[in-house]
């Protein structure tokens, strides 16, 4: 069964391929275009945001988005440099020309769409419900009377409390809140809670790193955010080249190879 992250990738791939077939600009944006030439493009990122972009034990910037950007760079004939930035100033850095792209788990919002030019969404981060594989919980409604854990002060808390199903008022107790999602996973594994709610991107990364095949992600969730690459409003040419490269990567399996390196799949 495809998880939501991969489903989003396949949907995005189809949209991009259709766009490439129907638009004259796609020819100009071909990832094999000789006109591209060698160039350097700067990606702005928060280098503490695992698994999208962060520093490893050797202080090297690594991550899912980092690997994607490098692969895209190879296809469009560009060297990709990664520049840590103040995340609160990311759009300012882009507008000033200090960076060419924001590529770091950048969620699409109406406000952001007014400020920047966005790529096609390439991944979805759901507020996922995660249980142990042998759990009887199959849907959001099954959380009634159950203990649920999540990270304190996270968007997950608000999503659970505001969910239109009203499940928050039917839980088997107060939300069990911890400083980090890692604590929530520990509670789930030990049986102290019945389910946890966490962003799917981080959740699947954690499960991949744990090496334990004991978890199950429900189809039901508490909402979804699409992620995209951001460009300056007037940089349509770069947007089209990146979109075309990502579409090719989804078609030829490169995207899945990078995905499977970083994320857990059932």
PLM region spans:
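C-terminal motif of bacterial Sec signal peptides marking the signal peptidase cleavage site
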Residues: 17-20
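Bacterial signal peptide processing site
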Residues: 22-24
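Extracytoplasmic small-molecule ligand-binding "clamshell" domains
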Residues: 28-105, 252
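Short loop->beta-strand "edge-of-pocket" segments that line small-molecule binding or catalytic clefts
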Residues: 41-45, 141-157
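Periplasmic-binding protein-like
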Residues: 47, 124-131, 200, 204, ...
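Ligand-binding cleft/hinge of the Venus flytrap
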Residues: 69-77, 156-177, 207-212
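Acidic, polar ligand-binding/catalytic clefts
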Residues: 70, 79-142
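A ligand-binding cleft/hinge motif common to bilobed small-molecule-binding domains
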Residues: 89, 106-114, 161-162, 187-190, ...
């Amino acid at each position: 069964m495809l998880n939501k992250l991969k489903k989003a990738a396949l949907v995005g791939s189809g949209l991009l391929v259709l766009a490439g077939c129907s638009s004259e600009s796609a020819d100009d944006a071909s990832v094999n275009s000789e006109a591209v030439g060698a160039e350097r493009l700067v990606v702005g990122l928060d280098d503490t945001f695992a698994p999208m972009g962060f520093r490893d034990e050797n202080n090297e910037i690594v991550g899912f988005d980092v690997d994607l950007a490098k692969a895209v760079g190879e296809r469009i004939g560009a060297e990709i440099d990664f520049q840590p930035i103040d995340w609160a100033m990311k759009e300012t850095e882009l507008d000033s020309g200090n960076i060419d792209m924001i590529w770091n788990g950048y969620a699409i919002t109406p406000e952001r769409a007014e400020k920047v030019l966005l790529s096609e969404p390439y991944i979805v981060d759901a507020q996922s419900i995660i249980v142990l594989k042998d759990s009887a919980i199959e849907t959001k409604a099954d959380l009634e009377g159950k203990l649920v854990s999540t990270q304190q002060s996270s968007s997950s808390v608000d999503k659970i409390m505001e969910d239109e199903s009203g499940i928050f008022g039917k839980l088997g107790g107060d939300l069990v809140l911890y400083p980090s999602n890692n604590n929530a996973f520990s509670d789930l594994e030990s049986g102290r809670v019945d389910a946890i709610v966490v962003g799917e991107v981080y959740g699947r990364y954690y499960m991949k790193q744990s090496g334990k095949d004991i978890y199950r992600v429900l189809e039901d969730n508490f909402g979804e955010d699409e992620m995209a690459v951001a460009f300056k409003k007037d940089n349509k040419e770069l947007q089209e080249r990146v979109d075309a490269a990502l579409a090719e990567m989804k078609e030829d399996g490169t995207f899945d190879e990078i995905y499977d390196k970083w994320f857990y799949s059932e």
